[in-house]
């Protein structure tokens, strides 16, 4: 463990390494990068440091253990206008699980009230026990961002990093950088502040920060490529369904139109009441429902595929004795998971259309027979001239 504390003074002092630093003062990869020679002169302090209080402390804490847990906590009061003060990420083996419960986010927000939020020394600690709590918090994040219009980009990028802590490389490959337009700027500003504090350690800190962001880069790409796609697809599907329900609820409350509450997962209401509509409108009505069921099938296949990993570990704790689940998972892996999902999607779409077409035929027949029966009853029991 390495702990470096720098007290702010009227002129920023230079943090020099000890003449004979112990071998455990820094992690092994950083000791080889830091030179024992005299460091260069520090840069001139920025304008916003002039007149700042001397009571603040800038703390940089780096810790690395054999279990793979990494902790980086930077409390930098250099820019007092930023709402974001520090990010604390604590997790063991990021590349093995979906570590939402072991992440912690710190940012300075004066008026934030939420069950997951606790105040501590002017900062806010956000902790949760499951994915649903985190997802609910960040689903309502726009209402919190409205209080801080100047920091919305920083908070949005931080929330995406919390939801997907270990998929930065996957997000870049999936062209999802559009969701994080200021992601690089945030990292650059944090790295710049660290370099101003510790100019002689800037190379080692940058490399250590990159290792924290992408530990076991090759393993992530090889092992979690398909699982990351499944998680992202499930999130996108859930967001899309939630957005549709929210829009329909708004239509019901504003326009008082109960017909707009009909979910897209089912057929349109006019499809049954108007059996003589054109074939184009009927086919479009089929696709409206089958398209939504397609997303449901895709998410179910993704979750079903991911469920084999914990089941296999429980069924066969000894890797030398493969179980039936391992062979079945390898058989599924022989086929492309994306291809299986697309096939299931098409199957559900055509089954949906075929089912409702087959269901509509007896419905139309019953309506026609009822109409003919009522007409015959009227003709037999009532006279035209009123006799």
From Swiss-Prot:
Region (Disordered), start-end ranges: 10-45
Keyword field contains Membrane: yes
Biased composition (Pro residues): 10-25
Keywords: Membrane, Transmembrane, Transmembrane helix
Membrane topology: Multi-pass membrane protein
Gene Ontology CC, one term: membrane
Cellular compartments annotated: Membrane
Segments traversing the membrane: 97-117, 128-148, 154-174, 186-206, 221-241, 292-312, 335-355, 362-382
Name of the featured protein: Putative transmembrane protein At3g54730
């Amino acid at each position: 463990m390495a702990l470096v504390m720098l007290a702010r003074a009227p002129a920023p002092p230079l943090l020099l390494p000890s003449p004979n630093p112990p071998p455990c003062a820094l992690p092994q990869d950083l000791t080889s990068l830091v030179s024992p020679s005299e460091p260069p002169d520090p840069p001139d302090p920025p304008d916003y440091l002039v007149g700042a209080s001397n009571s603040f402390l800038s703390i940089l804490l780096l810790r690395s253990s054999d279990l793979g847990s990494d902790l980086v906590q930077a409390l930098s009061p250099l820019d007092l206008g930023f709402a974001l003060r520090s990010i604390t990420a604590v997790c063991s083996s990021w590349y093995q699980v979906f570590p939402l419960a072991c992440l912690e986010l710190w940012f300075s927000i004066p008026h934030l009230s939420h069950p997951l939020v606790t105040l501590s020394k002017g900062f806010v600690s956000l902790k949760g026990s499951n994915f649903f709590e985190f997802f609910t918090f960040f689903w309502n994040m726009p209402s919190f961002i409205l209080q801080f219009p100047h920091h919305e980009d920083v908070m949005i990028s931080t929330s995406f990093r919390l939801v997907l802590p270990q998929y930065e490389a996957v997000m870049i490959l999936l062209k999802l950088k559009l969701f994080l337009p200021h992601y690089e700027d945030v990292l650059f500003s944090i790295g710049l502040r660290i370099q101003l504090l510790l100019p002689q350690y800037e190379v080692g800190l940058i490399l250590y920060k990159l290792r924290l962001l992408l530990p076991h880069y090759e393993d992530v790409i090889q092992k979690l490529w398909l699982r990351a796609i499944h998680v992202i697809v499930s999130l996108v599907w859930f967001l899309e369904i939630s957005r549709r329900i929210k829009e329909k609820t708004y239509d019901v409350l504003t326009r008082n139109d109960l017909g707009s509450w009909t979910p897209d997962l089912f057929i349109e209401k006019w499809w049954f009441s108007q059996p003589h509509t054109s074939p184009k409108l009927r086919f479009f009505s089929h696709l409206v429902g089958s398209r939504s069921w397609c997303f449901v099938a895709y998410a179910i296949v993704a979750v079903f595929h991911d469920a084999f990993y914990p089941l296999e570990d429980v069924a066969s704790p000894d890797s030398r004795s493969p179980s039936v689940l391992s062979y079945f998972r390898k058989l599924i892996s022989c086929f492309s998971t994306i291809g299986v999902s697309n096939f299931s999607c098409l199957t559900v779409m055509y089954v949906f259309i075929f089912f409702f077409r087959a269901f509509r035929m007896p419905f139309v027949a019953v309506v026609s027979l009822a109409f003919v029966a009522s007409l015959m009853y009227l003709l037999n029991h009532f006279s035209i001239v009123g006799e």
